[in-house]
Amino acid sequence: MLMKSRVNLLFKGPFFFRERCFQTLLNPVIAIRQLSHGSLRNSRSCRIDAKSNTLTKEIFPKINNEFKIKNRFYSSKLANDQFTLQEQCDEKGIPFILYVKDSAKKQLEKIAERKPEENSVLRVTVDGGGCHGYQVSFRMDNKIGNADTVFVRGKARVVADNISLPLISGSEIEYTNELIGSSFQLLNNPRAKTSCGCNVSFDVE
């Protein structure tokens, strides 16, 4: 009876399932994901507040099969050890995603080992310009904002803001070694209609 009263109190109003994840990142964070109940749509975004640097997981209990949680499907391109913090979704409730490939992961982990005190993340930004209308740039950063989505794989962390991410969601982040030099690159952007040969500039539908 006590359990039933507690559940009624927790889930008063629109039913929802809440998962709280605490992940050690550049800044201490708390990630809260709200999933729909019944015909309610999935929450479009997940906010992070800096309060703790300890990773735990709390899930409200499933009672009488009342809460049906749909498993999200990601492409097989997603590595098993990659996950997302401060997740953002499109208008259909589909999460935006960047695939951190092995080459990018290894290079970012090397950078993290050389300068662990800097807590650097790789920031991907899309600006207007270039020969095709939009251009992609990469830089190392040591700040994560409320509008950023963080893609974590091992010690590698890739960040994109809520303006850039919708234009490149589904792309792969690689680190390439070429005769002209080594660099991070954004490849196989499904949102791009055309792109330049150097994978820096693109246009969209």
Swiss-Prot record:
Q: Which GO terms describe its biological process?
A: [4Fe-4S] cluster assembly; iron-sulfur cluster assembly
Per UniProt, the keywords (alphabetical) are: Iron, Metal-binding, Mitochondrion
Metal-binding in keyword set: yes
Q: Which residues bind Fe cation?
A: 131, 196, 198
Listed InterPro entries: FeS_cluster_insertion, FeS_cluster_insertion_CS, HesB-like_dom_sf
Q: Which domain of life is it from?
A: Eukaryota
GO function term, MF aspect, one: iron ion binding
- Residue ranges crossing the lipid bilayer per the database entry: none
The entry assigns this protein to a family as follows: Belongs to the HesB/IscA family.
Q: Protein name, please?
A: Iron-sulfur assembly protein 2
Organism for this UniProt entry? Schizosaccharomyces pombe (strain 972 / ATCC 24843) (Fission yeast)
What are the leading ranks of the lineage? Eukaryota, Fungi, Dikarya, Ascomycota, Taphrinomycotina
Protein encoded by which gene: isa2
